[in-house]
Structure formats: C-alpha cells, structure tokens
Amino acid sequence: VSEAIIRNIAIHYEVIGHEGPWIALTPGSRRPYNELLNLSKEIASVGYRVLLHDRRNCGSSEVGFDASASEHEVWADDLHELALQLNALPLVVGGSSAGARLAILFAIRHPKATQGMLLWRLTGGLDAVNHLAQEYYGQFIALAQNAGMDAICQSEHFRSLIEARPSNLNKLKSTPVEEFIRTMTYWRECFLESSTLPIVGASEEQLHAISSPACLIAGNDVIHTPVTARKAAKLLTNCEIHENVVTHYPDDQLLKEWDRQEWKQAEPKLAKIFTAFLKNHSIQ
C-alpha cells in the first residue's frame, strides 16, 4: 500500500502482482478499492499487475474539488497521471458502475494509453441519472448551503473520509463553502446532461470512437440495466458482451438495487471471462 501526489492530491494506491501487463480496476460509487482485492488477486495470479487506487474524495485518499472538468473526467486524468508515475502505461482500464465510467472516460481522453477495457454494471437511463445526481451531488449542495462545511464534515460519506485520513478534516474545513458548492453544482450539471446519452458520461460518438477492445458484463438492476449494456456494446467498435454472469431478469422486472452478494459470488466468473478476453486479444 503506497501513496503518490497526483495533481496536488495525495492518492492511496496498491499494486497486486509483480509482472505482466498493467490493469487498473476501480469500484462503483465513491467506495474504497478494498472490495476489488479478491478479484484483483485472481486476475493477477495468471500474470498481470493490477493497480487499485482510492480516487480523490474516496477511501483513504485526500479530498480535493476541481471544477475544471466533470468528476469522472477528473478521476480519469488522476488515474492517467498515477499510471504515468508508476510507468504502468499503456493500461487495461476497468471497473464497475462509476469505475466503468472512469474507465470509458480514460479511453476517450487517453486513447494511446488504453490497451483494453473490462467493464461491469454500466449505468444509464433517466431514472439512474436523477437518482444518482441527488445522491452524489444534490444532498451535499443542500447541506453546504444550509449549514456550511461543518455539516459536510459530519455527513456519512465525508465523515468516513476523515476517519480514513484525519488530515481531510482540516482540508474540508478550509475549503471555502462557495468553492465546494460551485464544484458540486458543476459536477451535478455534467451528470444530469447524461440523461439522454447511451450511458452516463459518454455520447454515441465518443463510444463509437473508442478503438480499444472491450469486455462488458451486463448488470441486472434498474440503475445498471441490460439495455444500457446492450447500447454500449453496439456502439463500441470492438466489444464482447456477457448477459448471463448474474441472474437474468426480464427488462421490466429488474432488481431495485444491485445484489452485492451475488456479484461477490460471481467474481471467479468475472476473473475467468476477463482473463480469457485479455488472452484472446494477446494482452498477456
């Protein structure tokens, strides 16, 4: 477990494996990377190096609010800089949900640095966008407007970041509330713009322009719908899609929330599918 200063932010990271091509995997939401340790070890065991990191404002990394781009673009550029420092380019990029968004934006913004994509539980659709825009941004904008940065520090998510890295408390308290609200508002606007896009964060043209091979495992809940996965798979020029990794439900009977236990139990399947895909594309 190590740290690097990436664009003035301390980023907590870990490399699993000692040799072979580099793969970066990222979890969903703003969760820490620990949940991907077992999957990463399975993939690394057949000759890969897996880079895991806590994104800014996640896990044990430092908080930092950059309104120069959407949150997912900021994360994608942070990962590129981290991989550059570790001499880990080109990368196979992957992840679930928000981590899959990061991977796709990495491929869009850094095509020469991208060797392939391993994606699962892609997010898309109006319901998902509205629900997540409130969860990721709206609730924090309202808190900051009503009760300032003290209330942000006491919120469940940011409290967990302070527990993981106590210096985040001072950094949050010294962030001007106007700057925090401005950044969160801009990130929310970027997110809401995705309501008509095939997936959150990328247009049809952007997806179609990605030339790296992609392996995509469809979700089975209302936020990560099979329809979203199918749309993305059609638009990506070189993509294989798997719809039978977790329980398959009709499109009008999807789970209301993703089943963490089911995905945890499916990890050996994911590892098998992903490593077979990499070998098929001579990434070995």
Predicted regions and their residues:
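Hydrophobic, aromatic-rich cap/lid helix
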Residues: 171-203
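Gly/Ala-rich beta-loop-alpha elbow adjacent to hydrolase catalytic centers
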Residues: 95-99, 103
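Short beta-strand/loop motif that positions the catalytic acidic residue
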Residues: 210, 216-218
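Catalytic active-site module of serine/aspartate enzymes centered on a nucleophile-bearing elbow/loop
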Residues: 239-284
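Active-site loop/oxyanion-hole signature of alpha/beta-hydrolase fold enzymes
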Residues: 52-91, 257-268
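Flexible "cap/lid" loop of the alpha/beta hydrolase fold
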Residues: 104, 108-109, 114-145
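Conserved HGGG/HGGXW glycine-rich cap/lid loop of the alpha/beta-hydrolase fold
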Residues: 8-62
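Conserved alpha/beta-hydrolase "acid-adjacent" motif
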Residues: 222-228
